[in-house]
């Protein structure tokens, strides 16, 4: 029970910290994953030259999942290997409209810079 209570407390602290960011910024834009997409049939990916479990790619989205912040991932080009790269746009609590508007603008400005690679 103690661990659960600590997790709730940590979650509340994270929510407060993220909310403070939006005193200054309307949106946050950051990588969706720490590198290009990995192949769907692969259980590992390479980060900084090291093979790691593919599930580690989710670590950039977890804080915003915990805080309940509205977010969306948008294609943002291709790697030198032809794999898609994405960014996530995160907004204020309950401000999905701003997040989706920004995502639509970013996607529209990236015409021709993204295509679904074979096998995806």
Regions found by a protein language model. Name each.
Residues 1-66, 116-119:
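Serine-dependent amide/ester hydrolase catalytic core
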Residues 5-6, 16, 65-120:
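Structural helix-boundary/capping segments
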């Amino acid at each position: 029970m103690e661990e659960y209570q600590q997790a709730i407390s940590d979650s509340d602290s994270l929510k407060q910290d993220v909310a403070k960011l939006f005193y200054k910024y309307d949106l946050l834009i950051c990588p969706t994953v720490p590198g290009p997409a990995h192949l769907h049939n692969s259980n590992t990916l390479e980060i900084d030259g090291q093979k790691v479990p593919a599930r580690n790619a989710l670590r950039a989205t977890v804080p915003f999942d915990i805080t309940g912040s509205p977010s969306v991932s948008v294609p943002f080009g291709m790697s030198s290997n032809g794999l898609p790269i994405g960014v996530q746009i995160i907004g204020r609590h309950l401000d999905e409209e701003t997040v989706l508007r920004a995502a639509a603008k970013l996607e529209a400005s990236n015409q021709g810079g993204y295509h679904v690679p074979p096998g995806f």
